[in-house]
Amino acid sequence: MNFELTSAYKPTGDQPEAIAQLTEGVLQGVPAQTLLGVTGSGKTFTIANVIANINKPTLILSHNKTLAAQLYSEFKGFFPNNAVEYYVSYYDYYQPEAYLPNSDTYIEKDLAINDEIDKLRLAATSSLLSGRKDVVVVSSVSCIYGMGNPSDFYKNVIEIERGRMLDRNVFLRRLVDSLYVRNDIDLNRGNFRVKGDTVDIFLAYSDTLLRVTFWGDEIDGIEEVDPITGVTTAPFEAYKIYPANLFMTTKEATLRAIHEIEDDLTKQVAFFESIGKEYEAKRLYERVTYDMEMIRELGHCSGIENYSRYFDGRAAGTRPYCLLDFFPDDFLLVIDESHVSVPQVRAMYGGDRARKINLVEYGFRLPAAMDNRPLKFEEFEEMTKQVIYVSATPAEYELIQSEGIVVEQVIRPTGLLDPVIEVRPSLNQIDDLMEEIQLRIEKEERVLVTTLTKRMAEELTEYLLNNNVRCNYIHSDVDTLERVKIMDDLRQGVYDVLIGVNLLREGLDLPEVSLVAILDADKEGFLRSHRSLTQTAGRAARNVNGKVIMYADKITDSMRLTIDETNRRREKQLAYNEANGITPQQIKKARNLSVFGSPGSEADELLKEKHAYVEPSSPNIAADPIVQYMSKAQMEKSIERTRKLMQEAAKKLEFIEAAQYRNELLKLEDLMKEKWG
């Protein structure tokens, strides 16, 4: 099946040319291209058009789970009839195993798995292995982390066909081999039940119930059934049932793995003893022996991923299997916000290795644990044959890889121009800033101020508050959820000014902001580099009155580059608007920060008011005074209710709301322990 792009809008401005150039590059086999698109120019819509033109499976890599969710929503809107999948870490909470030798502290692994995201991950791999070309997978950096061997996964796909001879009990055994669990009472995802000649399977990768009926040893019927009403939704002549888990293995592979693990255990224990590490030798022997007993009895153990190399049959030092192995060789990789995402991919291997070295050296894990890891950056590069880097400020790496193939997209369909940039002396900068703030307050517009230090952000906030300016600050010490709330309050008008350090850059969509003030703009460094200045200035690009003021005593190279580039873009944007009779239109957007917006939201936002997800005002349950007087039974009921609310929010992929409920849940559980132990 081919991609079918659904949109009420046609490409405008720079989009047609960008789409044509990128499409031609991919079809000609160009290994790397860069889409340099300014904020609000419709980069997602451009990429969607390219995907529809080339008709190849595509992986879209984002640097965090929330942005990935937004992209997933938008691509679902653009391709409602195609397979748009979502692949991110399925942990609601994850504390990795670690050992701190300085304090002799061992930290056990702790986690909570999001069942809904697990389903979406399985759906992604199932779509890729189905052989269809019209697959888009939106992923976080999780795509480079280890998972099961795709060939083992595919071997356990069950293909059935109406009229085919198949013993019912053989079919049931195959379901068990594919890690489905029989449950004739409570049928949930990944379970199956048997009633006479009818087998109902709740598929692990969808909300579908599959009903297979037998007539003796013949498959008599295959149909999808609504799991709630029991009504048949679609009959089938043939069907593929994909496994219920990404990590598949066989009994033979398990026995072989145990034998190899025990051999390596003997060698490592002997090594520790030879260098006088008797305690580490004893610890390792006890831990691995216990794990092997658990695997023999139950088929799994805590931390079984540290033995993945043995189960996969890989040699020491070889890379793990990952999501990229499920794609065909000719897939397209799109890296969103590449100036952030590429360094993140590069850093994953080093961080993981640093943590595991201590676990191996102090006898907590076998050396094979080092092979349960994310891809090295070089391995990632080898596996990606065609890449499009997407960024408003591509880094040197992307430009070098693209060999000069940079496709520019600076025209906004709304006609909005890049903000005017002014440079003013730092002498009396606060007094000057106060005057500018008052002008914006009169127009009911908002102001962002970026400082170099946390202390300065806090002191400036205090000064402005003393002068009756409604303001707040955000920096790395402010909790993530609190930051989101503060930014939402800025949009709602609770504050007129928001002050920050390095948090006013990528991903902040605040159309009400008409002024960005950059203090100490001439202090060269990471926070005042050309890339940082350009990203920060872009926060004023969604307002028709957008303006940037740089307070400085001199113009640095970074400032000059940012100013020159912004002026060049403004000239091009003005010329286009004049030639086409376009009057810049202020972006209108529902005043609430969207975590998982409506489908096609970017395309909608460019040309009309967007109906965004409105976050409910969730109560601070644990802080309610009545909680202190609850009985144990009432407290347990409140905990269970909060857990359900968290799970419902997570199921809708409303991560911020789910995280709020999770925090409330933890507070209630702590209160429960405090009162009743």
UniProtKB/Swiss-Prot annotation:
SUPFAM superfamilies: C-terminal UvrC-binding domain of UvrB, P-loop containing nucleoside triphosphate hydrolases. It is found in: Cytoplasm. It comes from Bacteroides thetaiotaomicron (strain ATCC 29148 / DSM 2079 / JCM 5827 / CCUG 10774 / NCTC 10582 / VPI-5482 / E50). Forms a heterotetramer with UvrA during the search for lesions. Interacts with UvrC in an incision complex. GO terms for biological process: nucleotide-excision repair, DNA damage recognition; SOS response. SMART domains: DEXDc (SM00487), HELICc (SM00490). The UvrABC repair system catalyzes the recognition and processing of DNA lesions. A damage recognition complex composed of 2 UvrA and 2 UvrB subunits scans DNA for abnormalities. Upon binding of the UvrA(2)B(2) complex to a putative damaged site, the DNA wraps around one UvrB monomer. DNA wrap is dependent on ATP binding by UvrB and probably causes local melting of the DNA helix, facilitating insertion of UvrB beta-hairpin between the DNA strands. Then UvrB probes one DNA strand for the presence of a lesion. GO terms for molecular function: ATP binding; ATP hydrolysis activity; DNA binding; excinuclease ABC activity. Its main location: cytoplasm. This is UvrABC system protein B. Residues 24-412 form the Helicase ATP-binding domain. Belongs to the UvrB family. ATP binds at G37, V38, T39, G40, S41, G42, K43, T44.
